[in-house]
């Protein structure tokens, strides 16, 4: 259901802004996107798992907030990120 630490580290290496970056909006959005995809797969099998569905909605809301922040801060980085992650906005 959750993503592994190795997968999370791969995502961080791919989307980081500088060498020690783990908390930039790009990294946070990319990690949340992977977690959302994993949780979607879980919910396809377990349709009545409403507790996990609530967690999914919270993750989507957090990602939306970070995307809005990034769009206001740097529109070019925002456009590149949604294109590379395949997020429709």
UniProtKB/Swiss-Prot annotation:
A family per Pfam: Ribosomal_S15
GO BP term, example: translation
Lineage top rank: taxon: Bacteria
Molecular functions (GO terms): rRNA binding; structural constituent of ribosome
One GO location term (cellular component): cytosolic small ribosomal subunit
Function: One of the primary rRNA binding proteins, it binds directly to 16S rRNA where it helps nucleate assembly of the platform of the 30S subunit by binding and bridging several RNA helices of the 16S rRNA. Forms an intersubunit bridge (bridge B4) with the 23S rRNA of the 50S subunit in the ribosome.
Subunit structure: Part of the 30S ribosomal subunit. Forms a bridge to the 50S subunit in the 70S ribosome, contacting the 23S rRNA.
Descriptive protein name: Small ribosomal subunit protein uS15
Native species: Staphylococcus haemolyticus (strain JCSC1435)
Taxonomic placement: Bacteria, Bacillati, Bacillota, Bacilli, Bacillales
């Amino acid at each position: 259901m959750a993503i592994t630490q190795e997968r999370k580290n791969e995502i961080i290496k791919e989307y980081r802004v500088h060498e020690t970056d783990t908390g930039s909006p790009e990294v946070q959005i990319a990690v949340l996107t992977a977690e959302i995809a994993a949780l979607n797969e879980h919910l396809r099998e377990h349709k009545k798992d409403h507790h996990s569905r609530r967690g999914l909605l919270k993750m989507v809301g957090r990602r939306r907030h970070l995307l809005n922040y990034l769009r206001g801060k740097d529109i070019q980085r925002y456009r590149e990120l949604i294109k590379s992650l395949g997020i429709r906005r």
